[in-house]
């Protein structure tokens, strides 16, 4: 496991909670003023912090229909929201759907620790033919002096299917070798959908970097996911009524993190009782 990963999250099997941002100015679903949006997201982050999540990931989840290139007004609004709502002290990341360049720019401007995105591959998607370029994003990171911003590669993205015949394990290995992925993510078919456990196992087996489950995690399946993955990103199951685009439910978030901490203690105890090498 990467040393930086443990230094950043300061725990095994970190839980990264989503701060889903309501539709931003310019988006068809935008209903709130920017001030109201900031207030909404700050409340969510406060509730997540009270639940003691390990990190927060800001994402413009309700900027539907999704686009592959963020608009200037989206980037400006997202930057303001993150600056005003980010945790006072704590780890946080940025994901501007589905524009990795915008994600890196906003992350650098706001002091984020990581970005999540689709950086490699070619996909048939709801947004059309999708062919991201990890090399350009990595070079942008270098140009602006953001080398400390880690790149979390979603190699099984939502709302899309990969073209070609490579397996998830093959895509995972090549993303590490040719595109220098810091972390790999495995998702379900859409936001809130469970990731395929066998795919997660294949990717984990092929990986030398941390692997996180990216969607569909809830109290009921958390244990089996954490037995395989190095952590989880969770959003929908922490929301009021389990509705992806709703506000965070403080009680759901609290229960989820209590379950996560209990599972981590159990995993640590199991690890400590494993037999060591035979003595000579």
Where are each of the predicted segments found?
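Alpha/beta catalytic cores of nucleotide-metabolism and tRNA/nucleoside-modifying enzymes
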Residues: 139-145, 159, 218-223, 227-280
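Glycine-rich, proline-tolerant flexible connector loops at the mouths of alpha/beta enzymes
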Residues: 53-77, 122-127, 181-194, 241-243
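Alpha-helix-loop-beta-strand connector modules within alpha/beta enzyme cores
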Residues: 11, 67-94, 132-153, 195-218, ...
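Hydrophobic faces of well-ordered beta-strands that scaffold small-molecule active sites
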Residues: 15-19, 56-58, 92-96, 115-117, ...
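N-terminal small/glycine-rich loop or linker at the start of catalytic domains
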Residues: 5-33, 144-159, 197
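Active-site beta->alpha loop and helix N-cap motifs at the rims of alpha/beta catalytic domains
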Residues: 15, 23, 38-119, 277
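Conserved anion-binding
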Residues: 102, 108-182
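Catalytic cores of alpha/beta
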Residues: 99-112, 171, 206, 213, ...
């Amino acid at each position: 496991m990467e040393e930086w990963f443990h230094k950043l999250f300061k725990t095994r099997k970190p839980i990264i909670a989503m701060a889903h941002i309501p539709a931003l100015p310019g988006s068809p679903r935008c209903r709130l003023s920017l001030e109201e949006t900031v207030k909404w997201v700050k409340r969510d982050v406060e509730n997540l912090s009270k639940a003691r999540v390990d990190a927060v990931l800001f994402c413009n989840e309700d900027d539907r229909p999704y686009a592959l290139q963020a608009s200037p007004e989206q980037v400006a609004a997202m930057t303001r929201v993150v600056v005003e709502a980010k945790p006072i002290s704590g780890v946080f990341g940025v994901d501007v759907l589905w524009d990795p360049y915008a994600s890196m720019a906003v992350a650098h401007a706001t002091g984020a620790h990581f970005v999540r995105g689709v950086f490699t591959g070619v996909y048939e998607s709801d947004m059309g033919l999708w062919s991201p370029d990890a090399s350009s994003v990595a070079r942008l990171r270098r140009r602006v002096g953001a080398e400390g911003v880690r790149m979390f590669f979603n190699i099984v993205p939502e709302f899309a299917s990969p073209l070609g015949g490579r397996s998830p394990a093959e895509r995972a290995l090549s993303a590490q070798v040719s595109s220098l992925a810091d972390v790999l993510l495995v998702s379900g078919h859409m936001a809130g959908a469970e990731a395929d456990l066998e795919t997660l196992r294949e990717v984990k087996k092929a990986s030398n970097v941390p692997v996180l489950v990216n969607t569909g995690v809830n109290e009921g399946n958390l244990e089996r996911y954490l037995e395989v993955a190095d952590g989880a990103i969770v959003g929908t199951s922490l929301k009021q009524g389990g509705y992806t685009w709703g506000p965070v439910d403080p009680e759901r978030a609290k229960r989820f993190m209590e379950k996560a901490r209990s599972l981590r203690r159990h995993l640590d105890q199991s690890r400590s009782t494993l037999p060591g090498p035979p003595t000579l």
